[in-house]
């Protein structure tokens, strides 16, 4: 296993339904997430042509989870979100990571 000091740090963001946030937090914790924040919100998009085009549903209550994880763990988390929670399909959730180095400059 690679030394943690040489691994790249990722700012991982997960957007999910509020009723799934505890499961997501457990997953983040199992993969050494640090400085984890949860923000609850309600979307402003009304169901219409634009919403249908992007596959948005009527459930506007969301949780936005941000955490810092090593790149290897970020990949594992996203893989689990795709396999266990079908994040690779519409109306299930969104997850993405940004390299922290890119945020510094």
Positions of predicted regions on the chain:
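Positively charged, small/polar-rich N-terminal and surface patches that mediate targeting and assembly
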Residues: 1-105
């Amino acid at each position: 296993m690679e030394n943690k000091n040489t691994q790249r740090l990722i700012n991982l963001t997960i957007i999910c339904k509020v009723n799934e946030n505890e499961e997501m937090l457990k997953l983040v914790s199992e993969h050494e997430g640090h400085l984890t924040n949860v923000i609850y919100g309600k979307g402003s998009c009304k169901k219409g042509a634009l919403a249908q085009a992007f596959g948005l549903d009527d459930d506007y209550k969301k949780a936005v989870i941000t955490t810092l994880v090593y790149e290897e763990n970020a990949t594992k988390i996203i893989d689990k979100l795709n396999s266990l929670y079908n994040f690779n399909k519409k109306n299930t959730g969104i997850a993405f990571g940004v390299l922290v180095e890119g945020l510094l400059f």
